[in-house]
Each structure stands twice: as C-alpha cells, then as structure tokens.
Amino acid sequence: MSVITDIHAREVLDSRGNPTVEAEVYTELGGFGRAIVPSGASTGEHEAVELRDGDKSRFLGQGVLTAVENVNGEIAKAVIGLDVTDQRLIDQTMIDLDGTPNKGRLGANAMLAVSLASARAAADELGLPLYEYLGGPNAHVLPTPMMNVINGGKHADNNVDIQEFMIMPVGAKSLHEAVRMGAETFHTLKSLLQERGESTAVGDEGGFAPNLKNNEEPFEILVEAIQRAGYKPGQDISIAFDCAASEFYNKDTKKYVTVADGREYTAEEWTSLMEDIVDKYPVISIEDPLDENDWEGWKVFTERLGDKVQIVGDDLFVTNTNYLEKGIKMGVANSILIKLNQIGTLTETFEAIEMAKEAGYTAVVSHRSGETEDTTIADLVVATNAGQIKTGSMSRTDRIAKYNQLMRIEEALGSTAQYKGIHSFYNLHKQF
C-alpha cells in the first residue's frame, strides 16, 4: 500500500478560455497524477454542480478559485493518507465530505479533478498505462468514434437547431483506419461547403458551423461528403446526431421551437420528423431527441425508433444511476452518454457504465464542449470496453488529443486490440 502524501490544485483554462480546475496528486512511493476537468455548454439541469465563483470582476464570474481552495483545503485534508489504489474509498470519502446529493458544497469540478488525478497517480506508481490500471488485462476494445463534423445549437453561432451532426466509421477494421476515414470525410466536407459558398468556421467541438436552410440539409450534405470521400453511407460510415432538444423546447407551450425551419413542433410531430429522417438517411444514433423531463415522450420515441437506431440519453440521464435506473424500468432510450463531470467521480462513472451494460444499454463515453488537453476519457473508454466514444471533430487539439491517445493505445495493445465498428451497437439487433 502506498498512500497519498500531497494534493495541489490550480485554476487553468479550458478550450473556450474559461477557468477550470487542475489537480495534482503525489504518493509516498513517487507516483504522480495530474488531471484537468472539462465543462459543458448545454448542461442537463440534474447534473452535479460545477462550482463557479460568481465574482464578476474575474473571468466574468466564471472563476473556480473556490473549487481550487476546496481541493487544497478540505479535500486534501481528508484524502491525504489514503491508499492511492483504493479508488472507491477516495471517491466515497469526498462524497461523504461534500454531504449533498449533487456535490453542490465542494463542487463536482473539485472532486472530479482529485478523483482522476488519484487514478493517474496510482497507475504511474504501478508503472501501468491508465487504461490497463483501470480496466485490468481485459481492457482491449477500441471505440467506434462519433466525429462531430457539423456543429449547431449551443455549440455554434449559426441557425442550425440540432446541436451535433456526427459521422461514425462503422465499417472500419481498426481505430487507426476509423480516424483516417473520419479525417478524409472531414476534409471532403470542408471542400463541399466551400463549393456551396458556406462558412467553414468551426464550432466549440471542431465541426463546421454553416448557416443552412433547415435542419435536414446537414444530412444531405453529410451523405454527399461521405460518398465524395470514397465511402458508402450506412455501410462504411453512418450518421449520428445530437438534438440537445431541451435547448429549444419551450416549457410553457410544450413545443420544440426551431430557428432553421421556422416552425414549432409538438413532441408527436417532432418524433415523426425524426422517424422520417431515420428512414431517409443512414442514421444509426440519436442523442437527446426530446426534452430531458419529458419521460413519457421519450418512452413513445423509444417504442417507435428503438429497434432502428441507438437512442442516447445525455441530459436525460446525466451519468446518474438513479435516472438511468428509472429509464431502464420505463423502457426509455437504449443507451447512456457518459460524461465524467456530470456525476463527479470515477467510481460513480464506472457504476453507470456497469448498470447500462447489465440492462443491455450501450454506453458512449463523451467529452464536453469545453475541453482540455487531458486525455483520460480515451483511457476510460478502453478500460471499460464501452465500445463507443464521442470526442469531437478532426480539428482542434483539445479533440485530436483523444484520438491520438486512442491510436497509441491501439498500437500498445497490438494483436489483442479489437475495433468492433458496427458490432459496438449490441443494442440494435437489426443492424447485424
């Protein structure tokens, strides 16, 4: 047993220039771990609390000095002396210390930084790569990536309501090949947009952010880009998209108000529109198609489309086993998006992934729109054999860093590495 001897946190910046928490953990045998916490733009209302200072004289109120002080003070005092390899004890100690159901006192950003840095310190001390330390000898599945190539909604300053349009190289034979296919399609898409006189400026996650005539046009453009890049839509590369529907849902009128279409939709009408898109285009995954509190609407949506496509709950589940358990019992969605900072500790993240798998739901490990150079999620997705990752486009170093780490991991695993492609959708029997 080697104990934690020191913890230090500081305020650094994320990819949007907003402050975030970085923590370092040191052990008595020389282990060292560093982790930086990401942050989201479209956040679920049930997420764990990201503690911000609110001091308008610093970073427009977005500073995190209080969270940093919580790490360097209360958390350090409680965690120093604990066995660095006892992740569950470290995380539970912080949960108990916080004492709130949503980590609102110490901040999920403070707790997650320590949780992740502790795991890295333990891996460093044992001389193991992080994915092997977290997942053991069975960690071998490389994820099928969701590559966000067209941005809309809160991730871009354009008129597209749907937040993310993604390509998934389901026909690739390896992660390396998947990255190449994605990059080729991304660059082909750029040329296509330029030909059409559209903007090729990129959004928060590295995808292009053009103004388009409606919410269906991006699907048409993606199909053409995939074909021009030399691939078959639906066979080599499929399409995934994230509505982030809570962001354009009017709670008073109970309608989905779209800018691109200039229309308002009831849940029934919006579901029918999504069904038409699935029938018309090579779509394999839809995230947050309805408002996060419309559980009955989600149930109907799942009944109508659940055997055709992966239906991912992000704002709906917020990486929380309580909400996931409710969804499983109701038959809502068939997949969960996993975001470390939605729940705040590594232990609780593992619990959510495990619960999803046991229920036959897939788990998609995800970045946030405000990212950093930290690559923990690349190791996490391999450690858990989750099979899918959502980590942005083929641009911006904060996104590419994760792909580069995954390629390193695939190389290190050698012949034991497995890229499942279409078979990572084990919740969709009709795909095989």
From Swiss-Prot:
It catalyses: (2R)-2-phosphoglycerate = phosphoenolpyruvate + H2O. Binds a second Mg(2+) ion via substrate during catalysis. It is found in: Cytoplasm; Secreted; Cell surface. Its EC number is 4.2.1.11. Keywords: Cytoplasm, Glycolysis, Lyase, Magnesium, Metal-binding, Secreted. One of its GO terms (biological process) is glycolytic process. InterPro entries: Enolase, Enolase-like_C_sf, Enolase-like_N, Enolase_C, Enolase_CS, Enolase_N. Catalyzes the reversible conversion of 2-phosphoglycerate (2-PG) into phosphoenolpyruvate (PEP). It is essential for the degradation of carbohydrates via glycolysis. Belongs to the enolase family. NCBIfam families: eno. PANTHER family: ENOLASE. This is Enolase 1. It comes from Lactobacillus johnsonii (strain CNCM I-12250 / La1 / NCC 533).
